[in-house]
């Protein structure tokens, strides 16, 4: 399946149905009075997170979503049917932005979470609603209120427990393929990975999700190479696994290059727990391995793991280290609750916050 992490979508909720102007007509009843029913509500536009999706590719082929209008009211005090809702199915981790691409509407981080993006218009009142003691036969009714329409941006930030970062050809995809069932493209040239890949790793009967993103190079925060556009996919991770290839001539400089790009990107990426590993060590002899390990330790300020996806050396140890950090981070954070939104119990204000209540029919 092709990967797409950003999409522009046009949405429109349904208009409310018009109220009816009708009078009771029955034999032997001379003044039956008004019996026009109210119009039905227009349909809403919702967004909902579902399991099994990790791309927004479906929104490349369909960008317009419109709910149906409410049915007009009818005689005999019959209220029109409400319009049908439309629901956008998105992956967990999707953020919804206004057309300016900066104003956040909602951040959907839990499976099954729903949010109303556009409320349908209320139905108009029928003439029976306007009957008074001084006006027994009103001959007017309200039209339905129009629905809402807007253009929004969907932006996906994948949900993973650990993120793999490093220079191109640092062995990130090989690591992912060796510890999970993911099958990313692997080749001996830079930027083989063009989009993020996810895999589920298992260690000591515990599972966690790994995210592999395209490699970073110097100047990535300024758009050099693929740039830093995929770093958003590791913003939600608990821990970063920073891989430095043993084939680099200067492993300390390679580490600092990626670290600088993470700092330039911001969003607290450098505040996340970091595990550093010297990868592809099968290409070194013991003397060279000792030298480069010492150089990398000096650059990162900690003892790096020594791993090889080819021979399996050090793989179990680094997976256990990742697991321990993830367990610790999860224990410190309270579990998220799926917000329960009742029908029409939220109005989106200018600040994007929900307020109880519903629009009253004029």
From Swiss-Prot:
Transmembrane among keywords: no
Q: Which residues form the Obg domain?
A: 1-159
- NCBIfam families, A to Z: Obg_CgtA, PRK12297.1, PRK12299.1, small_GTP
Show the taxonomic lineage: Bacteria, Pseudomonadati, Pseudomonadota, Alphaproteobacteria, Hyphomicrobiales
One Gene Ontology BP term is: ribosome biogenesis
Instruction: Provide the assembly information.
Output: Monomer.
Stated EC number for the protein is 3.6.5.-
Q: Which UniProt keywords apply?
A: Cytoplasm, GTP-binding, Hydrolase, Magnesium, Metal-binding, Nucleotide-binding
Give the CC-aspect GO terms. Answer: cytoplasm
Q: Domain named OBG-type G: which ranges?
A: 160-327
Q: Where is this region: Disordered?
A: 332-362
Annotated protein name in UniProt:
GTPase Obg
Q: What are the names of the required cofactors?
A: Mg(2+)
Q: Which Gene3D superfamilies match?
A: GTP1/OBG domain (2.70.210.12), P-loop containing nucleotide triphosphate hydrolases (3.40.50.300)
């Amino acid at each position: 399946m092709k990967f797409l992490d950003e999409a522009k979508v046009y949405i429109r909720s349904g208009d409310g149905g018009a109220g009816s102007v009708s009078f009771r007509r029955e034999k032997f009843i001379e003044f039956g009075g008004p019996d026009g029913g109210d119009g039905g509500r227009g349909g809403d536009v919702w967004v909902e997170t579902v399991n099994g999706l990790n791309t927004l590719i479906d929104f490349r082929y369909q960008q317009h979503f419109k709910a149906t209008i409410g049915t007009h009211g009818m005689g005999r005090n019959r209220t029109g049917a409400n319009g049908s809702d439309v629901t956008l199915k998105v992956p967990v981790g999707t953020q919804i932005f206004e057309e300016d691409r900066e104003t956040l509407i909602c951040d959907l981080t839990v499976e099954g979470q729903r949010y109303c993006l556009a409320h349908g218009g209320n139905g108009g009142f029928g003439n029976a609603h306007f009957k008074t003691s001084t006006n027994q036969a009103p001959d007017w009714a309200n039209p339905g209120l129009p629905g809402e329409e807007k253009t929004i941006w969907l932006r996906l930030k994948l949900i993973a427990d650990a993120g793999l970062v490093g220079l191109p050809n640092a062995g990130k995809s090989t690591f992912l393929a060796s510890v999970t069932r993911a099958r990313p493209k692997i080749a001996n040239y830079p930027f083989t990975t063009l989009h993020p890949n996810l895999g589920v790793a298992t260690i000591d009967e515990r599972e966690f999700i790994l995210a592999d993103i395209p490699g970073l190079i110097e100047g990535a925060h300024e758009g050099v190479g693929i740039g830093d556009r995929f770093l958003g996919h590791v913003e939600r991770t608990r821990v970063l696994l920073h891989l430095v290839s043993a084939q680099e001539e200067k492993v300390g400089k390679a580490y600092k290059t990626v670290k600088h790009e993470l700092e330039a990107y911001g969003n607290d990426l450098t505040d996340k727990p970091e595990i550093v590993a010297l990868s592809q060590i099968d290409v070194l002899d013991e003397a060279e391995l000792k030298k480069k390990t010492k150089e990398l330790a000096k650059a990162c300020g900690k003892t790096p793991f020594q791993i090889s996806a080819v021979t399996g050396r050090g793989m179990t140890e680094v997976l256990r280290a990742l697991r321990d950090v993830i367990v610790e981070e999860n224990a410190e954070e309270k579990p998220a609750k799926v917000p329960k939104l009742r029908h029409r119990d939220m109005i989106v204000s200018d600040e994007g916050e929900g307020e109880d209540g519903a629009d009253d029919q004029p």
